[in-house]
Amino acid sequence: MTVLDIGAWDGFFSFEAERRGAKRVLATDSFCWGGEGWGTKAGFELARKALNSRVEDMEIDVLDICRDKVGVFDIVLFLGVLYHMRHPLLALERVFSVTGNQLILETHVDMLLTEGPVMKFYPGAELANDPTNWWGPNPVAVETMLKTVGFRSVKIVSQWPVVPYKVGKGVRLKIKKHWPFFQKIQQSRMVFHAWR
């Protein structure tokens, strides 16, 4: 089995894939490793040395990823990256092009109470005070985008936190920080699996 970890940063999931028996693992990043972001590649290098790992690395932007540059992988990890992309559908097209079998995608989601596919746009630092957070798709939008770029099957495998917790947190934030109650209960994080 081969694994591509897009947006690997410190490589936690890359090294875990290797530990679990992947014969080839390629970790990629550009935002953190290239100095543009707030992270660096130092943690990845330290872990690779400490683990005596054979995980490969490549500094490459998501939008530059293609078969010619990285190859095709059985499993592609795209964890915590989608909502940072200025062009999310184009990013998913690139991800699809190098996925041999399965994509595992984790992302921030918003507008959970909206039935159709929609995405919330965050100009500035509206989401978590981070100016690199651009989008909050709802689950239907994520599924629709994945199918639009070519994945034949998509499944939500994890969503958190559960509704009672979200309502309690929303009330607490409303009281303490005067944050909009409904905004908080409409946001979450989800994991999707998609197959070619």
Task: Give the location of each predicted region.
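S-adenosyl-L-methionine-dependent methyltransferase catalytic module, highlighting the catalytic core
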Residues: 63-69, 73, 77-78, 86-196
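Conserved Rossmann-like nucleotide-binding pocket used by diverse enzymes
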Residues: 4, 26, 56-58, 77, ...
